[in-house]
Design a protein with these regions (language model features):
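Iron-associated oxidoreductase/ferritin-like identity signal
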Residues: 1-180
Length: 180
């Protein structure tokens, strides 16, 4: 039987209330940074959806509406993880108003952002692996999600290579094919 389990079955003074264990400060700092990244992604996609709605890219707008909602869920999941560990999250300030020139630019920037998120989660997992297995396992879901997002945007980038992004008709065809 392990020492931890052996110690937990010994009688304790009922007048002493033990505080729960918390995550290490380094782990909390990394998760707070990812919360900021997820909110940045949320507002990026929210701005992309608004831009697409305004430009009548209706299918792309729906797609980016869903992306914004997903990123918000990711931020909320990270915050819940911290509060479940009795840690109050620190939500950093993020850019909330992003400007775009065209649909192709949104896709390129989204790919860069998703790839950056994937790299950040992967690097964080390497750091956390040796110090906190529970958080390491928790972050694997975020790596999986960002791997899927990165490959999805890579496919869109590849499809953009087939058209002239300066040609509005081709962009409308692209939107219909890949966001429909």
């Amino acid at each position: 039987m392990s020492t931890i389990i052996t110690e937990s079955i010994k009688p304790v003074d009922p007048t002493i209330i033990k505080k729960p264990n918390k995550l290490r400060k380094e782990v909390v700092n990394l998760i707070n940074q990812r919360i900021g990244d997820e909110y940045t992604a949320h507002y990026f996609y929210r701005s992309a959806a608004n831009w697409c709605h305004n430009m009548s890219y209706k299918k792309a707008a729906e797609f980016f509406d869903a992306e914004a909602a997903d990123e918000l869920l990711h931020a909320q999941g990270l915050q819940k993880y911290l509060t479940d560990w009795d840690v109050l999250p620190t939500i950093p300030k993020v850019e909330t108003n992003v400007q775009f020139e065209n649909l192709a630019e949104i896709i390129v920037r989204a790919y860069d952002m998703e790839f950056g998120l994937l790299q950040s989660y992967s690097e964080n997992s390497k750091v956390i692996f040796g110090m906190d297995q529970a958080t390491y396992i928790f972050l694997q879901e975020y790596i999986k999600q960002n791997t899927g997002s990165t490959t999805e945007y890579a496919d869109l980038l590849n499809a953009l290579q087939l058209i002239n992004p300066e040609n509005n008709f081709e962009l409308l065809y692209f939107e219909n094919q890949y966001f429909g």
